[in-house]
Amino acid sequence: SAPDRNVVFMIRPGYQSPAGNSSGWANPKDDDYTAANMARVAGALGALKTAYKSEKLVLVGHSGGAATSALVLGKHPGVADAALLLGCPCDVPPWRDHRNAQRGRGGPWVNSLNPLQFISGIPAGTPVVAVTGSQDDNTLPEFARRWAEQAAAKGVKSRYENANGLNHSSVQQWPDIHQKVNELVKELFP
């Protein structure tokens, strides 16, 4: 039987809820995968685990939320136990180069951490599924695939999956999300 589950929706620091609530800091140029913001997210997740008396925590993040999830796993080990990363810009410098070329402007994100640089902090055996839509022209599949391959080489139970026909936004409606979350939970509670 499945353990009791609580689902909590979080907004990244500096972003606003529909009610206008916000916390943290977001750079006007979106360069906000900072160490301080990752510490805020990790602190909030720790507080939620305590409040709900949670044994395990599975993160599900899209785009910047996926990068944040990958960073929390590596920079704050033990806060979360598994993750589903959807459309992850998991290798920030080449992703920024790609986005800048698409837009014909911009520069590097000098304040942001790169999830690839924190893979070694993720405890071995942590289950992670990284998924990118095959039609995603924002966070190209290669960024999440590279992260998953390097994480697996370090002992993380990571794998990459392609969501055929989906783009950066529509991957949020990928029909297999529920199944993948259930698989991650089953890995944590065999």
Specify the residue positions occupied by each region the protein language model found.
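The feature captures the conserved acid-bearing segment of alpha/beta-hydrolase catalytic domains
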Residues: 91-154
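Active-site machinery of serine-nucleophile hydrolases
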Residues: 1-27, 31
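Alpha/beta-hydrolase active-site loop
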Residues: 25-51
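Soluble non-cytosolic domains of exported or imported proteins
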Residues: 31-39, 138-142, 175
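C-terminal catalytic histidine-bearing segment of alpha/beta-hydrolase fold enzymes
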Residues: 145, 149-190
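Hydrophobic/aromatic beta-strand patches that form the interior of the parallel beta-sheet core
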Residues: 8-10, 82-86, 129-131, 161
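Primarily recognizes the serine-hydrolase "nucleophile elbow" in alpha/beta-hydrolase
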Residues: 54-101
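Solvent-exposed loop/turn segments at secondary-structure junctions
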Residues: 13-17, 64-67, 89-92, 134-138, ...
